[in-house]
Swiss-Prot record:
It holds the Pfam family tRNA_edit. Homodimer. InterPro entries: aa-tRNA-synt_IIb, aa-tRNA-synth_II, aa-tRNA-synth_II/BPL/LPL, Anticodon-bd, Anticodon-bd_dom_sf, Pro-tRNA-ligase_IIa, Pro-tRNA-synth_IIa_bac-type, Pro-tRNA-Synthase_IIa_type1. Catalyzes the attachment of proline to tRNA(Pro) in a two-step reaction: proline is first activated by ATP to form Pro-AMP and then transferred to the acceptor end of tRNA(Pro). As ProRS can inadvertently accommodate and process non-cognate amino acids such as alanine and cysteine, to avoid such errors it has two additional distinct editing activities against alanine. One activity is designated as 'pretransfer' editing and involves the tRNA(Pro)-independent hydrolysis of activated Ala-AMP. The keyword Lipid biosynthesis does not apply. Belongs to the class-II aminoacyl-tRNA synthetase family. ProS type 1 subfamily. The gene is proS. It is found in: Cytoplasm. The keyword Signal does not apply. Keywords: Aminoacyl-tRNA synthetase, ATP-binding, Cytoplasm, Ligase, Nucleotide-binding, Protein biosynthesis. The lineage of its organism: Bacteria, Pseudomonadati, Pseudomonadota, Gammaproteobacteria, Lysobacterales. Consists of three domains: the N-terminal catalytic domain, the editing domain and the C-terminal anticodon-binding domain. It comes from Stenotrophomonas maltophilia (strain K279a). This is Proline--tRNA ligase. One of its GO terms (molecular function) is aminoacyl-tRNA deacylase activity. Its EC number is 6.1.1.15.
Amino acid sequence: MRLSQFHLHTTKETPSDAELTSHRLMLRAGMIRKLASGLYTWSPLGLRVLRKVERIVREEMDRAGAVEFQIPTIQPKELWEQTGRWQKFGPQLLKIKDRKDQVFCYSPTAEEAACDFARSELSSYKQLPVNFYQVQTKFRDEIRPRFGVMRSREFLMKDAYSFHLHDECLVREYENMKSAYSRIFTRLGLDFRMVQADSGAIGGDASQEFHVIADSGEDALVFSTGSDYAANMEAAIAADPAPRAAASEAMRKVDTPTQKTCEDVAALLGIELQRTVKSVALIAGEGEAQQFVLVLVRGDHEVNEIKLAKVAGLDEQRFASEAEIAEYLGSVPGFLGPVAPAKAIRVVADREVAAMSDFVVGANEVGFHLAGVNWGRDLPEPEVADIRNVRAGDRALDGGELKIARGIEVGHVFQLGRKYAEALDATVLDENGKAAVMAMGCYGIGISRVVAAAIEQNHDDAGIIWPDAMAPWQVVVCVINPKGDAAVADAAASLLQELRDAGLDAALDDRGLRPGAMFADMELIGIPHRVVVSERGLGAGTYEYRSRRASEAESLDKATLLQRLQG
């Protein structure tokens, strides 16, 4: 590839609306161009990177025994209604009508369509197990697209769907896919972690995420120093709290006229924040099943909404209004507690709160809190659940200490069980000739997201630093004055061919730019290896070589250069 014949359009300006480093650098490098909110055109340069990720993904999926197919991105409403996700998916599901007023959606994921394909193609257990995968564009109507292709509305994804007669077989394929994903991200040259996760809107019995480690990551990842335990914040669990200590104080009312937060109350009373209890008022359910719920966490902790939604009866809830708070508690926000409610309420306390003694909580009276409060003596024992976010320093289940890092989710694997197959009546005949609902797994990788995540992990002030496997070219041969010196141009072309013959993905920068501008472009677009061919170097029988990760260039003869690049 000669760059004089390639569309390479870099810019020096930093886009004002680009918040993440990857977004800024992809725009400056000319990898993407914005078409509309959350929609991006991939340039020839960006597409080279995208295709390299695709190739590795396909190779490892094929190696793992999956077979490629292709599902339409436009899918009928009826299919999504059968699983209940037409409504449940919410406004992220882009809904459209054709000229006959038939309603469709632009697929954000393809469990329904994959299951529909399987039920039409598979009739016997002898055809199982099977794992179908595709690399296909998806669309989610994000309310606020941001961060470039990191959270765009349209994105490229590899999604796979496996079908099984028995759960044991599903578990084996799940482990097979976890291994395949680990190979994919290892080959891409990324520092990644696999963590336990919540299944979210897709559902299922078990799921794990793959995250690229990056300080800019949106997700908090939790690790233990005592084992290989790892989970995202939504699913992370700390060890049980120590047993509750005996009461040592009498309950008393304290004057807190303007102190409405746990922090302010703790400061006023001169106590540690962890001795206070935070009360969150919610309304769960609808109609006759509606109930007022007071959720309690320690003052220095935060409610984990995912864990809370798994508590019986709390899968659908909202914050209570001030009018509802007044009706049920006879109080106002800032002074709430599980104390003498005006009407019957449900109290759900985090495990840590249930283990507290001599704590401080709102008195349900404006301007007052209660101190020295104890369960059993002053308040009835609450319903107990794990409903908080863990924190760095918490004790892990394995006895180690929990640590927290930031990550960018790039892959997710699920054991779906029979949720979709039952809804869509996807059955095969088993060994006894009886209809059996198939067990299902699904496995996704955000291919376009991987590109942005790799940049977040691999960059410096000059630009992108691609891992070799993802770079648009592994090596670029830069020619000094290609039009003015035929010998230099010929030597560069000859070297390019030798690099290709050696199996390297190489390009020739023969655009005739000034050396400084040419080198700056190569650093910006992240070329791992730069070789300079110049009249002076040829005279000495050497080439100037610089690794993108090195601070200085070095002069090498051809044999040493080829050995270095192939090593």
